[in-house]
Design a protein with these regions (language model features):
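Helix-loop-helix hairpin linking two adjacent transmembrane segments in secondary transporters
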Residues: 4-47
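A membrane-interface helix-boundary motif in multi-pass transporters
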Residues: 24-36, 217-235
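Short amphipathic helix-loop junctions that connect adjacent transmembrane helices
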Residues: 92-107
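Helix-to-loop junctions at the C-terminal end of transmembrane segments
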Residues: 122-135, 219
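A late C-terminal transmembrane helix in Major Facilitator Superfamily
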Residues: 192-221
Length: 260
């Protein structure tokens, strides 16, 4: 699950880099056509390529209510809601900040690409530390703090360099959480992983929708910087909620185990 979460973070980061050049060539309608084609391709791969595995033993699944109300899973579900709500809201404003700082839209990839690549290198030591020292909880809390710092930094960012620095801090925390949280859901859910991950992914989608709506409304009514203030407040609430989470063994994000 750590690999799944990491791939989601990577795909989002890649979209930031390639969206503007693609838009210049084929326009917005072309981007939607590519997305539709990728969706069809994903369905074909799922149907024809992925093997159908039959369970050898019938495992009794916990009820949806039981999974939803499990305290550790509730913390993670609240976390993924906040993570993606603040993410979408933030990226309604960041492109405008870069334009105001003097960087045209078609050149934004020059900021996103190095920031994204460097963030993946910087997150690696934290993952290794969490695995070896069995300190995943501390790594997760640190990642939330990094997001909070980034949101606060955006409020005062008025140059391309300061915006890029805030983005780097943000992506280190974001990539850590995208890798950690799905694997933690799998560990806490135990025999009800399917149900728990279904609730988790649904909460993530609701967060994306809520962030877009709330972020757009705040931009129109209160100004761009209010979006970052809202994000910082939500992340502070998440930090308080996550603080009481119990520790897990480092193998929760054991990439070698996951890939095998």
């Amino acid at each position: 699950m750590a690999l799944v979460g990491g791939s989601i973070a990577l795909s989002f980061a890649l979209s930031l880099v390639i969206a503007a050049p693609i838009y210049r060539v084929i326009g917005l309608s072309g981007i939607f056509a590519i997305l539709a084609s990728l969706g069809v391709g994903a369905m074909l791969v799922t149907y024809y390529v992925l093997p159908s595995s039959k369970p050898t033993a019938q495992i009794e699944q916990a009820s949806l209510r039981t999974v939803f109300l499990r305290p550790e899973l509730m913390r993670l579900n609240a976390g993924v809601f906040v993570l993606h709500a603040t993410q979408v809201a933030m990226f309604l404003v960041v492109p405008r900040l870069l334009v105001q700082a003097g960087l045209p839209l078609v050149s934004h990839w020059q900021v996103y690409l190095p920031v994204v690549l460097l963030s993946f290198f910087l997150m690696a030591p934290f993952i290794i530390f969490g695995e070896k020292k069995q300190q995943l909880r501390k790594v997760m809390l640190l990642a939330i703090v990094l997001l909070f710092i980034a949101e606060c930094a955006f409020i005062g960012a008025d140059s391309v360099m300061s915006i890029a620095t805030a983005l780097l801090i943000y992506f280190v925390g974001f990539n850590l959480l995208e890798a950690l949280q799905p694997s933690l859901v799998s560990r806490f859910a135990k025999e009800s992983k399917g149900t728990a991950l279904g609730v988790y992914n649904t909460t993530q989608s609701i967060g994306l929708f809520t962030g877009a709506v709330a972020g757009g409304w705040l931009m129109d009514s209160q100004g761009d910087l209010s979006v970052f203030a809202m994000g910082a407040a939500l992340l502070l609430c998440w930090l308080i909620i996550a603080w009481s989470m119990r520790e897990l063994p480092a193998r929760a994000v054991d990439i070698s185990t996951t890939s095998s």
